[in-house]
Amino acid sequence: YNKLTNDSGSREDSIVMIGLKSGTVKLVQHQEEWHENAENVISVLKQLLGDTALDIQHVGSTAICSIHAKPIIDIAVAVHDIKDILPYIEVLKQHNIFFHEGAVAGEVFFVMEDGDIRTHHIHIVKRNGTGWSNYISFRDYLNANPEKAMMYDEFKRKSAVRFADDRKRYTASKQEIIGQLLSEANM
């Protein structure tokens, strides 16, 4: 966990939670500091990837202002072709950004972690592909439609209790509602 304190000194609002034990599920209230953390990582990625990264965006639940989320920052990186990222695997590794097998079809997946505490997921996707479009559309749709965000939040919270020790099943349990919300977003 990354813990940062603010000027108020209040213990309750001074801990920024980033990171979660691999394989587990715990949702926490949205924290404004997630955006700043994402921007810092995006800045590093821009420096490391240069023009290969056509766009880099904070996505996933930590980028949706009104909902609970696993305290793992998701970042999507758009490239012309997935293969464009391959020459950067070693450079990224030197910055504690590790290639991870078993990603979603159509993307290359990296993680940032400290031991078994995972802090960031970095999704490399084609700029004109469905993956990029889905990440951006989903985030923007839920940020623009608070009632849909709350519906998704309620579903996630129930699923997190049910699958607290099985992140794969938790993720699989959300696919139907995510598909429904993406259909609405793309209408």
Segments the model singles out, each with a brief description of its role:
Residues I124, T130-M187:
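Catalytic cores of NTP-dependent nucleotidyl/adenyl transfer enzymes across multiple folds
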Residues M17-K21, S66-K70, D114:
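Short, flexible turn/loop "capping" segments at secondary-structure junctions
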Residues V44-L86:
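Active-site nucleotide-donor binding segment shared across nucleotidyl transfer reactions
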Residues Q94-F98, M187:
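Short aromatic/hydrophobic-glycine micro-motifs
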Residues L4, G9-Q57, G179:
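Helical scaffold of the NTase/Pol beta-like nucleotidyltransferase catalytic core
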Residues I97-T130:
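Conserved catalytic core of two-metal-ion nucleotidyltransferases
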Residues P87-H95:
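Short amphipathic alpha-helices in soluble, non-transmembrane regions
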